[in-house]
Regions:
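Ubiquitin-like/PB1-type beta-grasp interaction modules and other compact soluble beta-rich domains
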Residues: 1-83, 88-98, 122-123
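Auxiliary tRNA-acceptor-end handling modules of aminoacyl-tRNA synthetases
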Residues: 54-72, 91-95, 103-304
Length: 304
């Protein structure tokens, strides 16, 4: 008989009695192996598997291919983006997951070229293969300021708790501050970031279903009066087949892009001197314009 105190929880809708202090990884170990569980929801909030399950918690497993799982996968991918490895003096912005992918903002760096993207992705694949663990640490504001003393954007997030920063909820929130370490197999820390998490247990689970897609300029906190940053975008999926299917969908959509077809068929154009998004129909596009106008008239008549 274990001397460990017992607690009551709800797992997948059913009551369970477990030892106090047990982690999600231990509680869900069979589902981790059988069903590809990579995280858990605790009282509705996504958590890392290495966190201890509290008494009274409602626990639900999160699989990699689920919506929550893909969001965690994509956020974890930002933590293997080896930009700081290539440019040690870069200033770290924010790195949230977005629809179908992720991005990370960087300051004090020149425009990112396609060659740089290829090199960053190459290094990401190496980090994924290494199987670095994502380790969560609770910190105080003073500890955060000390650890991130050379990172002005992170210091600002600590001070303001992310107020007004697009995507900053992945870094800080209303609760305490946390850091995530990328820990190598030998126990050394490869990289650290201010982050709320959650993350996958290991970089290896990111797999090969990711790719960097593009870069662009962005403003810190989305404010045009703020610093100009470089934003690197990527996409990530549960499998490489899912990635290829996504890339195929994008390629097919590009073929049907109305801007591309309009120019190729000499139907219309968007002259820059007139203004962005303002269409000029060509003679060959007269019938198309008529059909669009008639559709609008018909809809107005239908709805009175």
């Amino acid at each position: 008989m274990s001397d460990q105190p017992m607690i009551e929880i709800t797992l997948d809708g059913a009551p369970r009695t477990i030892e106090a202090g047990i982690t999600g990884a231990l509680l869900l170990q069979d589902a981790v192996k059988k069903d590809g569980v990579v995280a858990m929801r605790v009282n509705g909030e996504p958590w890392d598997l290495e966190r201890q399950v509290p008494a009274g918690a409602v626990v639900e497993p999160i699989t990699l291919s689920s919506e929550d799982g893909l969001n965690i996968l994509r956020h974890s991918a930002t933590h293997v983006m080896a930009v700081q490895e290539m440019f040690p003096d870069v200033n770290l912005g924010i790195g949230p997951f977005i629809t179908d992918g992720f991005y990370y903002d960087f300051g004090a760096i020149d425009a990112v070229t396609p060659e740089m993207l290829r090199e960053i992705e190459k290094r990401m694949k190496r980090i994924v293969k290494e199987g670095q663990r994502f380790v969560r640490r609770d910190i105080t504001e003073d500890q955060g300021r000390e650890e991130l003393a050379d990172q002005p954007y992170k210091l600002e997030l600590i001070t303001t708790k992310g107020a007004g920063a697009e995507g900053a909820s992945v870094e800080v929130g209303a609760g305490g501050l946390t850091m995530y370490d990328n820990v190598r197999r030998d126990g050394t820390v490869a990289w650290t970031d201010l982050c709320r998490g959650p993350h996958l247990p290991s970089t290896r689970l990111i797999g090969q279903g990711f790719a960097l897609t593009k870069s662009s300029s962005a403003y810190w906190k989305g404010d045009q009066s703020g610093d100009s940053l470089q934003r690197i975008y990527g996409t990530a999926w549960a499998t490489n087949d899912d990635l290829k299917a996504y890339q195929t969908r994008l390629a097919e959509a590009a073929k049907r892009d109305h801007r591309k077809l309009g120019a190729e068929l000499d139907l219309y154009s968007f002259p820059e001197e007139i203004g962005p998004g303002l269409v000029v129909f060509h003679p060959k596009g007269a019938m198309l314009r008529h059909q669009i106008e008639q559709y609008v008239v018909d809809r107005h008549q239908d709805y009175g």
